[in-house]
């Protein structure tokens, strides 16, 4: 049975919502959850319900706060929940780590404890964005604001494997985020990256403009973390704005097609746009499965993040990335 170390103390709604998500995941997904954090607080929230033995507690008395410097904090707080949870993966006690706490602390813990996969210079945050045709894997979504062409090439290989193995997309289309479709468009980074991506074994389809991302122009969209994070936050803001506009128009639309149908349509759209539906974002490139959650995650988002972790382990993504990057070593900057 797959075991997942879950940082019970990380996030705006910890530990209550984290534990609720763990309980739901244990029952629905059939995974063993190791809740890592303050034992007394966790036991109080569990109230004796350990999902038929599928939930265990690993005591970790310290917590890394959102305002703390990530690297300094994990060095000083060896008994923090995120450090202990990541160490469980390193020791083989757990198969994956999931946290809604400090993203910086999770990245630092994953890098220092799990290490990088050979051939990966910089791990990348991969996230899913809804499109007209399904979803697109966007990476990097914020881990690396300054990149070189070889970094984007590594992101592309890892993103392609994630889309193929975890999302089940055969020969996923990989696009390079740019300001134009032509090969010569963009800055020095994108122009050089384009040339490098053409030489890889992935299904590279060329440049994709911002508007094409949400129209299903590619299955994977590659960019540096600065651009990726702007895209991610813009998409979140736009989704909230559109939902607000829909609600403003409900009164008028009720007279046309009826309240029940409207609410069904609105609910379906909201689910497609809700980050909680997609769970968490795997940190690709570290030597283990590490899934990053939104800081405001509640139970549903945590459950879905645990599902992402389970599927990533089951599909052997980390070994696949190792093998692929070993084969593509000849493509250098």
From Swiss-Prot:
Function: Catalyzes the reversible formation of acyl-phosphate (acyl-PO(4)) from acyl-[acyl-carrier-protein] (acyl-ACP). This enzyme utilizes acyl-ACP as fatty acyl donor, but not acyl-CoA.
Domain of life: Bacteria
The entry's keywords: Cytoplasm, Lipid biosynthesis, Lipid metabolism, Phospholipid biosynthesis, Phospholipid metabolism, Transferase
GO cellular component annotations of the record: cytoplasm
Subunit structure: Homodimer. Probably interacts with PlsY.
GO biological process terms on file: fatty acid biosynthetic process; phospholipid biosynthetic process
Statement: the UniProt record of this protein carries the keyword Lipid biosynthesis: yes
A single MF term (Gene Ontology): phosphate:acyl-[acyl carrier protein] acyltransferase activity
UniProt protein name: Phosphate acyltransferase
Principal place of residence: cytoplasm
Pfam families: FA_synthesis
Pathway listed: Lipid metabolism; phospholipid metabolism
KW Secreted (keyword) present: no
EC number, UniProt record: 2.3.1.274
Subcellular location: Cytoplasm
Family as reported in the entry's similarity comment: Belongs to the PlsX family.
Organism: Desulforamulus reducens (strain ATCC BAA-1160 / DSM 100696 / MI-1) (Desulfotomaculum reducens)
Reactions it catalyzes: a fatty acyl-[ACP] + phosphate = an acyl phosphate + holo-[ACP]
Coiled-coil residue spans: none
